[in-house]
């Protein structure tokens, strides 16, 4: 009986020890998993800055080549997509700081990308139109932007995947 009790205790003891080891492994695995999740989460969130940097570099490249600001590029793209509209309507699509507004639109007029029109019945309203004479320049600009995006596509996709995984 004594031997049986010792054997039973030995089996129970082994079971208890196994449970303790298993619990230790589970706790350490959870901490490791949490650390990995935290590291992956932090990495993914940091990729927002990396992606933003890639986007900013595209706009910088366009600005350098075409002498147009980000807002001016976005105004043109919006006109090409939506058609002519008032300045007030454009404000819903492209945010231009009030102190830059006049200069931004006037620069596009000077570069001949757009022209302004004031309706006869309302002198306060200004409608902007894309200058259709610059159709070829439009194609060249779109190709330039597409190439700038394509050259960073893999890096941006990797950043985006890491962000989405968060």
UniProtKB/Swiss-Prot annotation:
Matches recorded under SMART domains: HTH_MARR
InterPro entries assigned: HTH_MarR-typ (IPR000835), MarR/SlyA-like (IPR039422), Rot (IPR016998), SarA/Rot_dom (IPR010166), Transc_reg_Sar_Rot_HTH (IPR055166), WH-like_DNA-bd_sf (IPR036388), WH_DNA-bd_sf (IPR036390)
DNA-binding region: 87-110
Alphabetical UniProt keywords: Activator, DNA-binding, Repressor, Transcription, Transcription regulation, Virulence
GO molecular function, one term: DNA binding
Further details from the record: Virulence accessory gene regulator (Agr) and Rot have opposing effects on the expression of selected target genes and agr also controls negatively rot activity by an unknown mechanism.
Family indicated by similarity: Belongs to the rot family.
Function field: Global regulator with both positive and negative effects that mediates modulation of several genes involved in virulence. Negatively regulates the transcription of several known virulence factors such as lipase (geh), hemolysins (hla and hlb) and proteases (splA through splF, sspB and sspC). Positively regulates the expression of sarS and other genes including those encoding cell surface adhesins (clfB, sdrC and spa). Also, modulates the expression of genes not previously implicated in pathogenesis.
Protein name as catalogued: HTH-type transcriptional regulator rot
Taxonomic classification: Bacteria, Bacillati, Bacillota, Bacilli, Bacillales
